A protein has these predicted regions:
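Active-site neighborhoods and metal-handling regions in enzymes and metal-associated proteins
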Residues: 1-116
């Protein structure tokens, strides 16, 4: 898992962005949110090993400003502490023998953008 976490963090930071640390991706199974946690930051070779049959949600949250967040009064909305824009996507990935299958597609986003 640490390799994924490291990749998200290093890619974001190489572009001058920051990553949210308080919220993480997760395993997906009988319940929507299960172990293991999949942080957006980490060290290569750390964390749980992935094995065939594991399904995880990688949830990069990339910010133009600082990495710290605050929760709004509505109890749901999360904002960066400096109010700068942030983007969040969720990718569901199934681990198979020697490979990973991305289960999430964003084809609908491309379709909408092509209509503009």
């Amino acid at each position: 898992i640490g390799d994924i976490s490291y990749a998200v963090e290093s890619k974001a930071e190489s572009g001058g962005f920051s990553v949210v640390r308080e919220l993480v991706g997760h395993g997906l199974g009988k319940h929507l949110h299960e172990a293991p946690e999949v942080p957006n930051f980490g060290k290569k070779g750390s964390g749980p090993k992935m094995s065939k049959g594991l399904v995880i949600c990688i949830e990069p949250m990339i910010n133009l400003g600082r990495k710290e967040t605050v929760q709004s009064r509505d109890g749901w909305t999360i904002k960066t502490i400096d109010g700068k824009p942030s983007a969040h996507f969720e990718y569901a990935v199934a681990v198979d023998k020697g490979k990973a299958d991305v289960l999430t597609t964003f084809d609908f986003v491309e379709e909408v953008l092509n209509k503009i």
